[in-house]
Each structure stands twice: as structure tokens, then as C-alpha cells.
Curated annotation (Swiss-Prot):
Disruption phenotype: Homozygous knockout mice are viable and fertile. However, they grow poorly and display lean phenotype, muscle weakness, osteopenia due to impairment of osteoblast maturation to osteocyte and male-specific sudden cardiac death associated with bradyarrhythmia. One of its GO terms (cellular component) is nucleoplasm. The keyword DNA damage does not apply. It is a multi-pass membrane protein. The chain crosses the membrane at residues 30-46, 55-75, 97-117, 119-139, 151-171, 192-212, 237-257, 265-285, 302-322, 341-361, 417-437, 447-467, 482-502, 519-539, 589-609, 614-634. Ubiquitously expressed. Belongs to the cation diffusion facilitator (CDF) transporter (TC 2.A.4) family. SLC30A subfamily. Residues 549-576 are annotated as: Disordered. This is Proton-coupled zinc antiporter SLC30A5. It comes from Mus musculus. It is found in: Golgi apparatus, Golgi stack membrane; Cytoplasmic vesicle, COPII-coated vesicle membrane; Cytoplasmic vesicle, Secretory vesicle membrane; Golgi apparatus, trans-Golgi network membrane. Residues 418-636 are annotated as: Mediates homodimerization with SLC30A6.
């Protein structure tokens, strides 16, 4: 049922909606035909790029529309089949044709800027992929974590093309090719891209992304019109025909006013026939058939992979002499081009595009199926849902960023980290920009070092946010200990940094290198100013960082007592007690302190080198800084380890000892055993204790007294187990041996005498 009714609403040949059930053997046949069609479309698009070097883009689109209209009108017979087209429908078809011409213009102009490989990667995405992407970005029901991951992959792929693709042929040219400026339209498009301040091929990437979004919106808006006029194929035939009449006057004007670069139009018949058949006709019909025979998500998945792989293969071999025999256009065998070459950035981008297309085209199965496990006493059916059914509805990316930023600014620690992170990033990018501008390797290296320091701030920021997350069924204590882990990891990072700085300093002491100090002083002074701001912001974290550990406390006096009863109760208190360690803030502070010491060391060594020529000053200062970093981080590592090992909090040790003595004096309390106290996070000191009470005592009164005493000692998350004589009698009735009962009572603290003077054995 899911396969049968889960498809696209595109009308089939007979006007029906949705896919139909097809046997698996025939389905495999359609999948193979779809893959072959996509590979041929890649061939046609590479051929189109070669044709556009000689033919004006408007003339090129006109010829494609003319050939497509001729074929579809001949075979579809839109005027003789179906209902007559009304005047209102002709107006809609005219608008449809205008929109189709605009999208084709954007598509093929992007092809001239980016080349066929990048055009295929950017533009050849199914509608369902783009709709899933937009729903993740701009709606609150994006389809769960998997869809969000797919959207992230798509965005990363586009960023790779923009930032890490060295396709700079167009950027290196002093002026645009002459064939592209022979009309006002193309000149206007070039001017718009130049206004963005990016290279032409990067502007082409943005243009193709825009064209892709327009194409998806165009297809979505066309579905109702296709139903009204009698099917998608009839609409396509009529729209292509109207497009020919729209472009015809424009082409005539261009032919009269511009000089053609084509020597013989007859030689282009075969190339144009190849493009028309592979790109326009075969792809359209194959998509229409597959959308009827199988689910639209399968069409998207099976169609995207072959076209992307074909794009990579043709991008590498298209200009190679061995492919000349496969090409319709003649070119000398020795003529090779370096246009839009295959680069590492485009390969990485292709991998991310393939992953994103596979994820975004997959159907969302969240909460679709449940297993009937029975009925309630009232007769209501009970279902068991697995997997994604329990997941929260995903938020859109803008809303998630907005909510996260709001949480960051709500609390003092995360707000300080965020502000300093922004300042650090600003200084980092200014340093990188100035380093690239002046070709200074020192500035660029220091910029990347600052970027690494920002990663520690990001980790601290995430830890500060996660520590405020509410407790869940799985993490019943909440996420407060994330700050301890963050501080511990930051401490380990600093130890590694100190070790490598120490080893490098020792090596340079043996053979001091000569340094270029031209840019060291201004960079170090700028870094020192930034880090001093951080020192002032985070200094409170260091001053409150002492005395925070976690541990456990227990007494063992080996006394044997009479059997006592068992009750059970829990006392909880959740107030804040001071003195706790925020290891996360201490870790951030120590990172900033290390950077500050580094800036001071660079300034001092620069002055000594410039004034006295003491090149040994640089390794000496670095050695001193490495030792200081190591010594300053040891207390953080020690305290964090004690917390993770559940040590008794040192700042509460004396108070807890006094509290246990007070508990012994409570009226009606015989003894206690297994007292355990530890620090869970900066604000939570937890504890558990077993108390043995007389049979006639009121349990809640004892629990309240014990809770009050331990709360005054700093324990704000307490569990108390009350045990009475009936419990031990019950254990004896279950044939519990003497040694088992002794094991339960050997840690009891006894008062030796009850109030009536009876001695307890």
C-alpha cells in the first residue's frame, strides 16, 4: 500500500495519478533504463556546453525548443486528442512557456559559467530532494534527524563548490568571451554577477542554485495545469510550441544584428539532434514512465547516482583524445582544454551531493507503523511503536539557531563564552584576511592557531548549553556532568599543547633559528588585547575553581546487631550550594590564559631579538610558557578526575562528618550504614544512606530530620532507605544465611544503648 499510493501526483499517460504495482523483474528493467537515460543526458549536456561556445544562448534554446516541439507535437498530437483548450487555459499555457524559457535561460547560462560537470551536480536534482531540503530549512516538520543530515550534506556540497573548487578559468580572464557580450541580455546577467563581487564560475553556482529552486517551483505549479489540459505530455508539447513562437522574434533580431560564429549550420545538425533527444525528449519521457511504474522517491534515488557518476567520468575524460570518437562535434585530437577541470573540491562536493540526494529522497517512515500488543481494561487498543516514533519533531534550521542563541544569551557562563568566541573569530578572520593580502605565512599560521583555540571555546559553549538540558528517562541525573567532561578534555588538550611546545622549544634551544620579526609585534599585541578581555571575563571561573570533587563516604565499624526491619523512603533536596567547581569555565579560562602567555612570550622574545639579537630568547620563552601551561592545568585535571571517580567533596568533608555524628543522636534511630556522598556537578552534591530505626518510630519524622541535617551539610540530592526489624525477619524467612545478614549489618553505626538502657548486641 505504501508503494502503491506514496508516489508523486504527476499524471500518467492516461491521466491517472500515482505509481502502479510492477513485478520486480520489470521494475529492474525500468531502473536500468532510467540509469541509461541519465547517463545519456550527461552526454547531451556536455555536448551542449561545446555548442554554446559557437552558438548564442538564445539561438541555442530556440533550436532545442523547436526540435522538442516538432517531435512532441508529431507524436502527442495535442490538437487532435483530448478536450479542446479554452482561452483561459491558453493564457496559462503562455505563462507556463514564459516561465520555462526563463528557467532554460538561467540553466544554460549557468552551464556556460560553470561547465557541464558542475551544472549536472547542481541542477540535476529531483523535485522531492529539493522539497525535502526546503522543508528541513524552513518548516518545523522536516522529517527527522536523517533529513536534517541530508540537508546539511547538500549545503556542504554547495559550499565546497563555492570555496574549495579551483575552477578559476573564467576568473583569470581579463574580459569575458566575445560571444557572450553580443546581446543586452547576457551583458545584463554578467553585470548582475559582477555586482555580487564573485568570480563568474562562483556566480554560476549561485545562479544554478536559483534556477534549481525555480525549476522545482515551476514543476509544482504545473501539476494542476497539466491535469486541466489533459496530461503532462500534452502540456509539455503545447508549452514547447508556444516557447518557439515566443523566441522566434528574438532570434530573428539577433541574427540580423549580430555576427554569427558558426561557419556551417549543417555541421551542427547531428550535435543538436543529440542534445534534443538526450536532454529534452528521452529524459522527459523516461521520468514520466518511471514516476508511474514506481515510487517517485525510488526514481530520485536511482536517477541521481548514475548522472552524478557520469558527470565525474565525463568531466575527467571529455576533453581527452580517446573520447573524440564518442563526440558529435569535430575537434582535433591534440586539442585539449583546461576549462572547468576536475578538482578535489568538486569531487568532495559530488560525494556530498550523492549522499544528500539518497537521504533526502528516502521516504520518511517515522511513526508510520505500530504493533498491536493488546487492549486496555476499557477496550482501547494498545500499540507498540519502534524507532523514530519516539523522536521529537525536528525544528527548522533558522528556528533551531534562534532558540539556541536565546539559550546561549540567557545564562552568564554561556553568554560570556559566546561573546568572547565572536571576538576571537573576528580577530582570527581579520588576521587571515590580512595574511592573505600581504602574503604573510606567519599571520596565516597564527590565524589557524587562533581558529584551533576557537574550537575549545565552541566545545565549552556546547557544554554550557547541554548542562541545562532537562533530565530524561535515559539520563535521569540530567547533563550537568557535561561541564566536567568538557573541562577534563580541555585540560588534556592543553597538556598535549604544552608537551609539543616543550619538545619544539628544546629542539630550538640546541639550534636557535633566525626569525622574521616584522609582523610578530603587531599580531602579538592584537592577540594580547583580545586575550586580556577574555582573562577579565573568565577570571571568576578560576577563582571559584578550588575544592570541587566528587567522592563517596562510608563507615565500617564491623558491629553485629539484632535483626532490624526494613522500610523504604527517599528524601530529595535540590537547592544550590556554593563552592562547586565549574570545570568547563576553568578549562576555557586556562585556554585563554595559555594564549595570553603565548602573546606575552612572543612580545618579550621579539623585543630581545630586535634589540640584542638573542634568537635563543624565542625557545626560552616558549619553554617557560609550556611549563606554566602544564602547571596551571594540573589542578583542573586533578579536580576533574576526582569528580569523575566520585570522591567525597573536599569542601563538604568536615560538614558531612559532623552531620553523621548528629544523625547518630536522633531519637529512634538505631544506626546507619552505607553512607555515600559525591559531587555530581557544580550545583549538585548527591548522597545515599541506609538508616535503621526502631519498630515504633514514625519513619517520615526520621527521614525529615536526616534530610535536614544532610542538607545543612551541603547534600542537595539525597536518597534515604529506612530499615526496620521486620525486614531482617523477612530475610531470615527467605532462608538468608547468617553471613548474608551479617553482611547487611556489618557497616552499621550503633549507639550501643537504646533510650531505655537496653544494650544492643
Amino acid at each position: 500500500m505504501e508503494e502503491k499510493y506514496g508516489g508523486d501526483a504527476r499524471p500518467g499517460p492516461g491521466g491517472g495519478l500515482g505509481p502502479v504495482d510492477v513485478p520486480s523483474a520489470r521494475l529492474t528493467r525500468y531502473i536500468l533504463l532510467l540509469c541509461l537515460t541519465k547517463c545519456l543526458k550527461a552526454v547531451g549536456l556536455f555536448e551542449s556546453y561545446d555548442l554554446l561556445k559557437a552558438v548564442h544562448i538564445v539561438q541555442f534554446i530556440f533550436i532545442l525548443k523547436l526540435g522538442t516541439a516538432f517531435f512532441m507535437v508529431l507524436f502527442q498530437k495535442p490538437f487532435s486528442s483530448g478536450k479542446p483548450i479554452t482561452k483561459h487555459q491558453w493564457i496559462k499555457i503562455f505563462k507556463h512557456a514564459v516561465a520555462g524559457c526563463i528557467i532554460s535561460l538561467l540553466w544554460f547560462f549557468g552551464l556556460t559559467l560553470c561547465g557541464p560537470l558542475r551544472t549536472l551536480l547542481l541542477f540535476e536534482h529531483s523535485d522531492i530532494v529539493v522539497i525535502s531540503l526546503l522543508s528541513v530549512l524552513f518548516t518545523s516538520s522536516g522529517g527527522g534527524p536523517a533529513k536534517t543530515r541530508g540537508a546539511a550534506f547538500f549545503i556542504i556540497a554547495v559550499i565546497c563548490l563555492l570555496l574549495f573548487d579551483n575552477d578559476d578559468l573564467m576568473a583569470k580572464m581579463a574580459e569575458h568571451p566575445e560571444g557572450h557580450h553580443d546581446s543586452a541580455l547576457t551583458h545584463m546577467l554578467y553585470t548582475a554577477i559582477a555586482f555580487l563581487g564573485v568570480a563568474d564560475h562562483k556566480g554560476g553556482v549561485l545562479l544554478l542554485v536559483l534556477a534549481l529552486c525555480c525549476k522545482v517551483g515551476f514543476h509544482t505549479a504545473s501539476r494542476k495545469l497539466s491535469i486541466d489540459v489533459g496530461g503532462a505530455k500534452r502540456l509539455q508539447a503545447l508549452s514547447q510550441l508556444v516557447s518557439v513562437f515566443l523566441l522566434c522574434p528574438w532570434v530573428i533580431v539577433l541574427s540580423v544584428t549580430t555576427e554569427s560564429k558558426v561557419e556551417s549550420w549543417f555541421s551542427l545538425i547531428m550535435p543538436f539532434t543529440t542534445v534534443i533527444f538526450f536532454v529534452m525528449i528521452l529524459d522527459f519521457y523516461m521520468d514520466s514512465v518511471c514516476s508511474v511504474k514506481m515510487d517517485v522517491s525510488k526514481c530520485a534515488r536511482y536517477g541521481s547516482f548514475p548522472i552524478f557518476i557520469s558527470a565525474l567520468l565525463f568531466g575527467n575524460f571529455w576533453t581527452h583524445p580517446i573520447t573524440d570518437q564518442l563526440r558529435a562535434m569535430n575537434r582535433a585530437a591534440h586539442q585539449e582544454s583546461t576549462e572547468h577541470v576536475l578538482s578535489g573540491g568538486v569531487v568532495v562536493s559530488a560525494v556530498f551531493f550523492i549522499l544528500s540526494a539518497n537521504i533526502l529522497s528516502s521516504p520518511s517512515k517515522r511513526g508510520q507503523k505500530g504493533t498491536l500488543i493488546g487492549y486496555s481494561p476499557e477496550g482501547t487498543p494498545l500499540y507498540h511503536f519502534m524507532g523514530d516514533a519516539f523522536q521529537h519533531s525536528s525544528q527548522s534550521v533558522p528556528r533551531f539557531i534562534k532558540d539556541s542563541l536565546k539559550q546561549v544569551l540567557e545564562e552568564s557562563d554561556s553568554r560570556q563564552i559566546f561573546y568572547f568566541l565572536c571576538l576571537n573569530l573576528l580577530f582570527t578572520f581579520v588576521e587571515l584576511f590580512y595574511g592573505v593580502l600581504t602574503n604573510s605565512l606567519g599571520l596565516i599560521s597564527d590565524g589557524f592557531h587562533m581558529l584551533f583555540d576557537c574550537s575549545a571555546l565552541v566545545m565549552g559553549l556546547f557544554a554550557a548549553l547541554m548542562s541545562r538540558w532537562k533530565a530524561t528517562r535515559i539520563f535521569s541525573y540530567g547533563y550537568g556532568r557535561i561541564e566536567i567532561l568538557s573541562g577534563f578534555i580541555n585540560g588534556l588538550f592543553l597538556i598535549v599543547i604544552a608537551f609539543f611546545v616543550f619538545m619544539e622549544s628544546v629542539a630550538r634551544l640546541i639550534d636557535p633559528p633566525e626569525l622574521d620579526t616584522n609582523m610578530l609585534t603587531p599580531v602579538s599585541v592584537g592577540g594580547l588585547i583580545v586575550n586580556l578581555i577574555g582573562i577579565c571575563a573568565f577570571s571568576h571561573a578560576h577563582s571559584h575553581g578550588h575544592g570541587a570533587s566528587q567522592g563517596n563516604c562510608h563507615s565500617d565499624h564491623g558491629h553485629s546487631h539484632h535483626a532490624h526491619g526494613h522500610g523504604h523512603d527517599h528524601g530529595h533536596s535540590h537547592g544550590f550550594t556554593g563552592g562547586g567547581m565549574n570545570a568547563n569555565m576553568r578549562g576555557v579560562f586556562l585556554h585563554v590564559l595559555a594564549d595570553t602567555l603565548g602573546s606575552i612570550g612572543v612580545i618579550v622574545s621579539t623585543v630581545l631579538i630586535e634589540q640584542f639579537g638573542w634568537f635563543i630568547a624565542d625557545p626560552l620563552c616558549s619553554l617557560f610558557i609550556a611549563v606554566l601551561i602544564f602547571l596551571s592545568v594540573i589542578p583542573l585535571i586533578k579536580d576533574a578526575c576526582q569528580v569523575l571517580l566520585l570522591r567525597l567533596p573536599p569542601d563538604h568533608e568536615k560538614e558531612l562528618h559532623i552531620a553523621l555524628e548528629k544523625i547518630q543522636k536522633i531519637e529512634g534511630l538505631i544506626s546507619y550504614r552505607d553512607p555515600h556522598f559525591w559531587r555530581h556537578s557544580a550545583s549538585i552534591v548527591a548522597g545515599t544512606i541506609h538508616i535503621q530505626v526502631t519498630s515504633e518510630v514514625l519513619e517520615q519524622r526520621i527521614v525529615q530530620q536526616v534530610t535536614g541535617i544532610l542538607k545543612d551539610a551541603g547534600v542537595n540530592n539525597l536518597t534515604i532507605q529506612v530499615e526496620k526489624e521486620a525486614y531482617f525477619q523477612h530475610m531470615s524467612g527467605l532462608s538468608t544465611g547468617f553471613h548474608d545478614v551479617l553482611a547487611m549489618t556489618k557497616q552499621m553505626e550503633s549507639l550501643k544503648y537504646c533510650k531505655d538502657g537496653t544494650y544492643i548486641m
